[in-house]
């Protein structure tokens, strides 16, 4: 009897143990990452040919204690290598693990290689050559603490390489994991199986091979025992011949069918090639089709299983499309696949909740470094009077109501950018802004008292409902998370896409960027204030301080301002402002852009202006500003400097976003100024529900 070890992906050990026992293995013992077992020579070859789950089959050769590199060398040399290698066999060493003595795996591999080669030269035998790429024998050494375990890797290449997939092709899951997913899916061979996001077809091919009794090792060309002196070619040929006979019989007797689809024509072509090379191409129908086009291929029965490994995203900007995808799949399953089973394998379990289905079973597994879950569902048969469940019903109804109200109003006003929803319902704490045919959903970060999983699930529901109500493509929804800035610069950089969208606001054309910054380049709540500036600016010299992207300057310029001066500390936003001006034909010396600390520039400037717009941050302690700024504390000092630049009969429009801001009217009077609050006049319909979003004042000489 041979003592053997089969390695596998984490989470599949018990499944592998059952498989090995069914092959005839005895004394199976599960450990993390694999199974120890025993079997005769035939079982060695049976496990190599038939295991769908094992990553490798190892023949342990011995162990040794390693307190020095000499210990490793002598421990390896104690094995009788000369009776293990066929004459002329090449070899390679795979060394893993480190300890205080062996601190580099390459060094460990070199010491093992030296010990093996020296075992031959000491007996005056030809030394075997190393071949790292395609060796006849692979020696595996695993060092754990002070113990080195030495084994012969009888697999050669990993057993997931079945021989049907082009090695250059990208596979999100290995074939061994795919086989486990099939086994755990609840699918019964003989019933239909469908993968609507099949990629290169791995799940379907593994299922078809399982169903037709086709050994996973049947198409492999190389093995790790070809240079092994104890290899029994006669028994191997018997095992191989039996596998070929069973495969022919299984294919001839199988009557059910497999269906695969994907939106990418190139991967579908690869899937067809892979299925043909696996010998089961005639059983699988592959189509180029998006999930949105998915239909039941057998509406009159029999019932089957939908099995898939849908895409998942680690980036925030990919989530809306994935949420929409899962939500859509859930609706299609309920509408078209009543009575079927569904099994999905995912690294993003939160996305699976978008299906709006209750899982019957779930399994955990590792896909490389990723923690994954597989959930199995049974889709209830729909009845004529059953109504589809609505996602986030209260939110959906409110958004639909707001859309009906604001869409018509925005068209009449001549604006393309407006707020559709602003935390109208406390449990759906987001803002939804429309920018032409794009939508930005800003999630207000939930308090720490709210369960993070529940908050994330609610956000997923919001996104799915928003896409559905507005009828937009998922890739035209941008998701952002907004937190209190705590004194940080509000113009935080989020990305580097550099994609700008041209939008219309009354008679102005403006550039917005929906993805790269927390804000988009256009403060929607100041829309009416900008229009007022345009109406007030004819023939006047206009100053815009803390100008951001210069949208107020554009309105003033279009309103007939004699000159405009735009000041901001950020070169990025000044360049953006210049693009906005150029888009509206506002170029030349009459339109100046100045990069400067606005407060420092204000103290030193000696020019005169008829109309000044200033919208400072509530608080700023930017390293590039000379002093920290607090709008409540410092607004009077600001007005003192502004008065010096204000021409007789001129007007300052002052706005800020501080909630509860109190204008120091007595202090203003001492400066010879008076203030008229115009906040209500500057709040448009879409911001009428949030009366504290900003406050706005007209300040003139008393």
Curated annotation (Swiss-Prot):
PROSITE patterns found in the cross-reference section: THUMP, UPF0020
Alphabetized InterPro entries for the sequence: 23SrRNA_methyltr_KL (IPR017244), DNA_methylase_N6_adenine_CS (IPR002052), RlmKL-like_Mtase (IPR000241), RlmKL-like_Mtase_CS (IPR053943), RlmL_1st (IPR054170), SAM-dep_methyl-trfase (IPR019614), SAM-dependent_MTases_sf (IPR029063), THUMP_dom (IPR004114)
Cysteines joined through disulfide linkages: none
GO BP annotations, alphabetical order: rRNA base methylation; rRNA methylation
Origin: domain of life: Bacteria
MF GO annotations: 23S rRNA (guanine(2445)-N(2))-methyltransferase activity; RNA binding; rRNA (guanine-N2-)-methyltransferase activity; rRNA (guanine-N7-)-methyltransferase activity
Localization in the cell: Cytoplasm
Enzymatic class: transferase
Assigned protein family: Belongs to the methyltransferase superfamily. RlmKL family.
Protein name, entry field: Ribosomal RNA large subunit methyltransferase K/L
Organism: Escherichia coli (strain K12)
Highest classification ranks of the organism: Bacteria, Pseudomonadati, Pseudomonadota, Gammaproteobacteria, Enterobacterales
């Amino acid at each position: 009897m041979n003592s053997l070890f089969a390695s596998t992906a984490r989470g599949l050990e018990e499944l592998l143990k059952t498989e090995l026992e069914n092959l005839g293995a005895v004394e199976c013992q599960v450990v993390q990452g694999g199974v120890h077992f025993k079997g005769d020579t035939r079982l060695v070859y049976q496990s190599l040919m038939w295991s769908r789950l094992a990553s490798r089959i190892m023949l342990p050769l011995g162990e040794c204690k390693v307190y020095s590199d000499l210990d490793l060398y002598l421990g390896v040399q104690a094995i009788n290598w000369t009776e293990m290698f066929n004459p002329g066999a090449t070899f390679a060493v795979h060394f893993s693990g480190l300890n205080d003595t062996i601190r580099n795996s390459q060094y460990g591999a070199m010491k093992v290689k030296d010990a093996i080669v020296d075992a031959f030269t000491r007996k005056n035998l030809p030394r075997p050559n190393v071949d790292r790429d395609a060796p006849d024998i692979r020696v595996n050494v695993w060092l754990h603490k002070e113990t080195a375990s030495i084994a012969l890797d009888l697999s050669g290449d990993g057993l997931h390489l079945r021989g049907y997939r082009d090695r250059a092709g990208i596979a999100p899951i290995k074939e061994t994991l795919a086989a486990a997913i099939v086994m755990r899916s609840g699918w019964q061979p003989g019933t239909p199986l469908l993968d609507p996001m099949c990629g290169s077809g791995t799940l379907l091919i593994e299922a078809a091979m399982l169903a037709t009794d086709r050994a996973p090792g049947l198409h492999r060309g190389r093995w790790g025992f070809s240079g092994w002196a104890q290899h029994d070619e006669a028994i191997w040929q018997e095992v191989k011949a039996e596998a070929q006979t069973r495969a022919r019989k299984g294919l001839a007797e199988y009557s059910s069918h497999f269906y695969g689809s994907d939106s990418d024509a190139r991967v579908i072509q690869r899937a067809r090639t892979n299925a043909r090379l696996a010998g089961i191409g005639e059983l699988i129908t592959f189509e180029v089709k998006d999930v949105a086009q998915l239909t039941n291929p057998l509406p009159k029965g029999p019932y089957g299983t939908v099995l898939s490994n849908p895409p998942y995203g680690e980036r925030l900007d990919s989530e809306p499309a994935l949420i929409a995808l899962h939500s859509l799949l859930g609706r299609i399953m309920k509408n078209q696949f009543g009575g079927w089973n569904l099994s999905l394998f995912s690294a993003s379990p939160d996305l699976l909740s978008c299906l709006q289905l209750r899982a019957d079973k779930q399994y955990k597994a590792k896909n490389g470094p990723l923690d994954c879950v597989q959930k199995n569902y049974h889709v209830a048969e729909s009845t004529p009077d059953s109504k589809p469940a609505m996602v986030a019903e209260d939110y959906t109804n409110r958004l639909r109501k707001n859309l009906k109200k604001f869409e018509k109003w925005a068209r009449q006003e001549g604006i393309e950018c407006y707020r559709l929803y602003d935390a109208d319902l406390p449990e759906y704490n987001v803002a939804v802004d429309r920018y032409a045919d794009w939508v930005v959903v800003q999630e207000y970060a939930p308090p720490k008292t709210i369960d993070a999983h529940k908050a994330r699930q609610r956000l997923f529901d919001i996104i799915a409902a928003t896409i559905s109500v507005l009828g937009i493509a998922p890739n035209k929804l941008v998701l952002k998370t907004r937190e209190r800035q705590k004194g940080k610069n509000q113009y935080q950089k989020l990305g580097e896409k550099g994609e700008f969208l041209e939008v219309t606001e009354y008679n102005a054309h403006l550039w917005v960027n929906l993805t790269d910054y927390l804000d988009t380049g256009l403060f929607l709540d100041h829309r009416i204030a900008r229009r007022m500036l345009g109406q007030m600016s004819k023939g006047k010299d206009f100053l815009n301080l803390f100008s951001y992207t210069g949208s107020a300057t554009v309105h003033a310029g279009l309103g007939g301002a004699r000159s405009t001066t735009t000041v901001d500390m950020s070169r990025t936003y000044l360049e953006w402002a210049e693009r906005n001006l150029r888009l509206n034909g506002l170029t030349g010396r009459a339109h100046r852009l100045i990069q400067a600390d606005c407060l420092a520039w204000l103290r030193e400037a000696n020019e005169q202006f008829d109309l000044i717009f200033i919208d400072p941050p509530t608080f700023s302690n930017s390293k590039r500003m000379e002093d920290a700024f607090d709008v409540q504390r410092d607004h009077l000092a600001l007005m003192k400097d502004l008065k010096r630049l204000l021409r007789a009969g001129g007007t300052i429009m002052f706005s800020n976003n501080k909630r509860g801001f109190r204008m120091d009217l007595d202090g203003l009077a001492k400066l010879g100024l008076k203030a008229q609050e115009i906040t209500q006049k500057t709040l448009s319909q879409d911001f009428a529900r949030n009366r504290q979003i900003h406050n706005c004042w007209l300040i003139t000489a008393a």
